Amino acid sequence: FLKDHFTVKLEPMAKTSRRSHAKFLKMRSLFAGKIAGAPGQDAEAYALAKKHGVQVVFGETRVLMQQATLGLIASGTATLEAALIGLPHIICYRTSALTYLLAKRLARVSYIGLPNILIGKMGIQERIQKDCHEDQLAKDLNTLHDGQSYTKKGWEQKRMSDELKSILGTQKASKSVAASILENL
């Protein structure tokens, strides 16, 4: 089950990474065909990424984010880490229909990305379920970078880093994140 769930999440990102690489040859990291391997996932789970010519790198997530121009990131703490680094990205999340329906009924939050939850608005585009596909993700990336430089929206995401650091800096980060999530439940 977990391997199938993981593959469902990975497929649109792998396809978009390969497709965007052809358009943005000068970009680094994701557009150099790399994906940060998630801790706890074995290399076999990334067979789909390799099939699409995407290199999987383990233990270097922060380095990849720091070197990247743009990112496609599955929802979770990695989205907050990317936002704090100042990496413009799209939050991607796809799971089984049953899991999605259960989560939607149980968790009543306006956003799934930690940066969006913390700032209380859609600062980073979230693509969930049927909206998380290659064509849409490629369009979203184009709203952040035009192939030569960041767009207005891309620069806005880069500046979100300061706002998030301000929010998290007033308390211990984990308490601040937990309080913000509880407020939004």
What does each model-found stretch correspond to?
Residues 1-185:
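Nucleotide-activated sugar donor-binding and catalytic core shared by glycosyltransferases
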